[in-house]
């Protein structure tokens, strides 16, 4: 694998640090008037999802992580594992709850997901940026109930709870941003 100096760190770069794969989320290169230049780096552990902030000297280098992202189609959840399929080879992979994490609430049948593999094992699952889900439970919106600018909680078909505008009703399909968990729009 390639080696990267700390001033080469960019968001999205996957590196090996302390024997585990990390993804760089942000990197700020600092060159003080006095002393050696350094980089302040925010990274996410790919195995657990935890975030770490580290400072590296400009001369420090780290190996690139041998991880690869694959576009796979989500098939189903059997209660213990989430099953995905490669559309080119029809090979199936299963990811455990640790790899899926909180993203399980955004997975719908036939959704194109990015599965990150390390040593052939899934370590992270990224759902599509936007999903369309049906509202299965929410409070009814009363006519003239517009005093608050907020919204109301709505339970979606996958079990996720999202704050929606007051005019949205049960049975409607809405578009949700999976990165922030926020309501985007109604789907016509």
From Swiss-Prot:
Q: Which HAMAP family match?
A: EF_P
Where is this protein localized, as stated in its record?
Cytoplasm
Kindly give the CDD domains that the UniProt entry links to this protein. S1_EF-P_repeat_1, S1_EF-P_repeat_2
- Keyword tags: Cytoplasm, Elongation factor, Hydroxylation, Protein biosynthesis
In UniProt terms, what function does this protein have?
Involved in peptide bond synthesis. Alleviates ribosome stalling that occurs when 3 or more consecutive Pro residues or the sequence PPG is present in a protein, possibly by augmenting the peptidyl transferase activity of the ribosome. Modification of Lys-34 is required for alleviation.
Q: Name one GO biological process term.
A: peptide biosynthetic process
Q: Mind telling me which SMART domains this protein's record contains? A: EFP (SM01185), Elong-fact-P_C (SM00841)
Pathway annotation from the record = Protein biosynthesis; polypeptide chain elongation
Q: What kind of modification does the protein receive after translation?
A: May be beta-lysylated on the epsilon-amino group of Lys-34 by the combined action of EpmA and EpmB, and then hydroxylated on the C5 position of the same residue by EpmC (if this protein is present). Lysylation is critical for the stimulatory effect of EF-P on peptide-bond formation. The lysylation moiety may extend toward the peptidyltransferase center and stabilize the terminal 3-CCA end of the tRNA. Hydroxylation of the C5 position on Lys-34 may allow additional potential stabilizing hydrogen-bond interactions with the P-tRNA.
Q: Name one GO molecular function term.
A: translation elongation factor activity
User: Where does this protein have coiled-coil stretches?
Assistant: none
Domain of life (superkingdom)? Bacteria
The record's similarity note reads: Belongs to the elongation factor P family.
UniProt cross-references to SUPFAM superfamilies, sorted A to Z: Nucleic acid-binding proteins, Translation proteins SH3-like domain
Q: Which GO terms describe its cellular component?
A: cytoplasm
Protein name, entry field:
Elongation factor P
Q: Which species is this UniProt entry from?
A: Yersinia pestis
């Amino acid at each position: 694998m390639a080696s990267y100096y700390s001033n080469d760190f960019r968001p999205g770069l996957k590196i090996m640090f302390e024997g585990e794969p990390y993804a760089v989320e942000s990197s700020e290169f600092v060159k003080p008037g006095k002393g050696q230049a350094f980089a302040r780096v925010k990274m996410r552990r790919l195995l657990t999802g935890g975030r770490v902030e580290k400072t590296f000297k400009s001369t420090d280098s780290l190996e690139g992580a041998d991880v690869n992202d694959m576009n796979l189609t989500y098939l189903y959840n059997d209660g213990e594992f989430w099953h995905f399929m490669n559309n080119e080879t029809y090979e199936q992979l299963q990811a455990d709850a640790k790899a899926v994490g909180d993203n399980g609430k955004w997975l719908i049948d036939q959704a194109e997901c990015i599965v990150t593999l390390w040593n052939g094992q899934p370590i992270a699952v990224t759902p599509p940026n936007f999903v369309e889900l049906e509202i299965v439970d929410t409070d009814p919106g009363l006519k003239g109930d517009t005093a608050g600018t907020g919204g109301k909680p709505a339970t979606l078909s996958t079990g996720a709870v999202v704050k929606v505008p007051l005019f949205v009703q049960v049975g409607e399909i809405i578009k949700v941003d999976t990165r922030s968990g926020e309501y985007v729009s109604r789907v016509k």
